[in-house]
Amino acid sequence: MNTGLPSQIQVIELLGGEVARAGYEVEDVIIHTWSQPFWITVLADGDTVLARDIIATLSHSVSALLDGLDNIVDRYFLEVSSLGMGRPFTSEKHFRRARGRKVELAAVGRIPADRSNWGDVRRHGDVGDPRRPRLCGMRDPAIEIMKAIV
């Protein structure tokens, strides 16, 4: 069935260069075919915060690129956003991008007092408090982090 929409891979390939020129990368593209008009969500992220003015500029660029496709419907909603504060840490780049930001961590068990310290993300590997540890303790075998959210 032809929905009149490009595939997720086509959108990522199409937008990757434009988003990279702005200093960011396309983290994900979600194409919602259940709504009318269709909804396309582009999630971008980078080492600097994706501010509103940058999102607005990217939205215009992304829209122009999508409108230039042959297989795009006449009407669609476009959302350009970032995972922002709810982003899970799933790779080293997420830790790097969170540098200097406050985080919430859930540790398995207790973190010994000699390894706890209040603080924000400093560098990959900091040790911290069970309520808000600094993130270099990840490699410490005595500390197992269950969940980390910026």
UniProtKB/Swiss-Prot annotation:
UniProt KW keywords: Cytoplasm, Ribosome biogenesis
Function of the molecule: Required for maturation of 30S ribosomal subunits.
Pfam families found in the cross-reference section: RimP_N
Gene3D superfamilies per UniProt: RimP-like superfamily, N-terminal
Statement: the UniProt record of this protein carries the keyword Cytoplasm: yes
Gene: rimP
Matches recorded under InterPro entries: Ribosome_maturation_RimP, RimP_N, RimP_N_sf
Record protein name field: Putative ribosome maturation factor RimP
Any one GO CC term of the record: cytosol
GO term, biological process aspect, one: ribosomal small subunit assembly
Native species: Mycobacterium leprae (strain TN)
Family: Belongs to the RimP family.
